[in-house]
Structures are given as C-alpha cells and as structure tokens.
C-alpha cells in the first residue's frame, strides 16, 4: 500500500510524505489540491511497481509542473491570486473549487460557463456547485458552438440557489468584472 501523509496544501503546490512499507519519502509538487495529491500518489505507486525507487520518483517532482489550463496560476501584479482551470464536468469544477477554497484567505470568485453542443444536464449541476463552493460566481459564455449562449447561461443559472452570482455573457467582460471585484487575499 502507498499512502500520502502530513499533507500541506499551499497556493504554489503541495508537500507530503509518501509512505510505502518501511519507507517515507518527502514529495514537493507544484500541483495544488487534494485531487492532485491523489493523482501524484497513483503515479508514484505505478512507477514504484515498475521498479523505480521512491527517491528517484520524488526527485522528478522537483521540476515545476505546469499543465496549461489545469489549476494553472496566472501571475499578475495584484494582491490576489488568479487561476485557470478547464473544469468541464460537475466533479472537475467541484474539485477545483474545493482545492482553491483551501488555499484562499479571502473570497473565492469564479468565472465560468459551459460549452455548447455538450451534455445539457450537467449545466444546472455545475451552477449549483459553483454557487455552493464560491463566494461569488460570474456566469459567462464558453464556446457555445452552434447553441444560443443565452440558453446555455439560463441552463446554468437554473441550478443556482444563491443570489451571489452575476451574468456577463461576454467572457472578457466577465473576467474584467471578476478582477475589478477582487481584493487582497482573494
């Protein structure tokens, strides 16, 4: 069995000990969120079972890991943090928001939309999850394809129970609004 212990989640990554049999090896990765700790643990276990030492595996995480659009930090000159995540399912959105909530000192503001010509049933669920885990939600358009962007937004908003959301169909304007509302620690 492989286990991740003494987990520390930070805005610039995660630190934890990997335990297997009588070994404990520290791992530091630039990936944030518990779901990435689990993903890292699975990768470690797979490599170890193929004969790679835990120490060698741990060293591979020393290099920065940036996966474009996956919990990717956007560095801007501001007293708050900005992340981009491709979360396109209810579970992915929830995982991203839970991870960000754990490292956010202030409010969690999310800008999101759902793509067109895709599963319509997930839209209200994603709206509900966003409203549940974020302090403020800005619903916007996200590649509507051949669908009416306003119809997609209506589907999303139908699942939202909180009043803490805005609808800004133009994505650039939605992002600008989020940035203008963010404060130190958000």
Residue ranges and their predicted role:
Residues 127-181:
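C-terminal helical cap/extension that packs against the catalytic core
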Residues 11-12, 20-136, 158, 162-164:
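Nucleotide phosphate-binding/pyrophosphate-handling subdomain across enzymes
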